[in-house]
Amino acid sequence: MARRRMGEEGKGGGWGLNGRQCRFGNRLRAVKGEGWRSAVAAQAATGRREEDDAGGREKGEKRERKGGLSPCLFGKRRRERRRGGRGRREALPPSLGGLRAERRGRGDDDVLINYNVQHVSRIKLEERLLITDKLSLRFLDPIFFGEYPREMREILSSNLPKFTPEEKKLLQNKVDFIGINQYTAIYAKDCIYSPCALNTYEGNALVYTTGVRNGAKIGKPTAFSTYFVVPESIESAVMYVNGRYKDTTIYITENGYSQHSDTNMEDLINDVERVNYLQGYLKYLSSAVRKGANVGGYFMWSLIDNFEWVFGYTIKFGLYHVDFDTQERIPKMSAKWYRDFLTGSNVTDDTQVWSRRADS
């Protein structure tokens, strides 16, 4: 899918839709079943693009719109990881160890990104191509194409290091799969044609991001202050990465819902919101697979409540409630729903889940 510049419609402060992600999580293996459950776990066999890397980039250049640069250039970096060149075998963490056999003997060279995707909101719906997330692509583009994204080169110019031919050869096509941590979406404002405070982390990108516009949140809030429930964002992220990087296998390495730890015990255990969150995101992930995205698997964050690097013990992502004083672990409603989802046994639908209790 080609990158597209912000057009004349974007002048005056156009807003976009941006999918944000965080941290690396545990793998909960998906079991193939019928319907969209199997679509989530299975790799798509159709919709493969036949463009080579150079051809795809050339077409992307030709699809530029008149006007300024892409409104969103970089996002926040929480974590990026990349293994060495093929042949240097490193032990995978337990959560990914099972993937080695799936690679049919190839080295497990991979990269994990916290991926932000954007839609331009002022062009026709059918033209809502995803705008490049410059932070994630500043790692992926050199690996796949041997150079930084065009927007980075245009804005940062001589401040960017130059890759030698030897470095380009060393970098290119050394990845077997891409891991995406995907949780939410945010609005992104173009700061090339609109006044913005640029003393933020994203300031060099000439972009301003927020989860609220004109007093309205982009989605239902969660305990994680910058994460909102926007299920369609996972499909957007997967489809963009799949198209840009020539159908490299994609794993959703994190996706999950957070609760406040001071929530009463009954609501913590009967976590209806988490069940609805998982249903929504898996539905859109299934849609991406059906459209041809090469999705190899899905990892839910997280199996149990844990210490979060930013919020400590004040928020809970787990399918299992943990009493941190006694270490007792209690399955939540979401744990039982997810078990049924993986095994294909009587998954509760949207109308039933609101009345279902965790002790059922």
From Swiss-Prot:
Residues reported to bind a beta-D-glucoside: 183, 254, 301, 308-309, 317
Region annotation (Disordered) ranges: 1-21, 35-103
Keywords (A to Z) from UniProt: Disulfide bond, Glycoprotein, Glycosidase, Hydrolase
EC number per UniProt: 3.2.1.21
Glycosylation sites: 346
Chemical reaction(s) catalysed: Hydrolysis of terminal, non-reducing beta-D-glucosyl residues with release of beta-D-glucose
One Gene Ontology biological process: carbohydrate metabolic process
Disulfide bridge positions per record: 191-196
One MF term in the entry's GO annotations: beta-glucosidase activity
Residue intervals passing through the bilayer: none
SUPFAM superfamilies assigned to the protein according to its UniProt record, in alphabetical order: (Trans)glycosidases
Keyword Disulfide bond: yes
Enzyme active site: 254 (nucleophile)
Record's compositionally biased regions (Basic and acidic residues): 1-11, 47-67
Pfam family name, one: Glyco_hydro_1
Compositionally biased spans, kind Basic residues: 75-86
Family stated for the protein in its record: Belongs to the glycosyl hydrolase 1 family.
PANTHER family, per database record: BETA-GLUCOSIDASE 16, GLYCOSYL HYDROLASE
Protein name (record): Putative beta-glucosidase 15
Organism phylogeny: Eukaryota, Viridiplantae, Streptophyta, Embryophyta, Tracheophyta
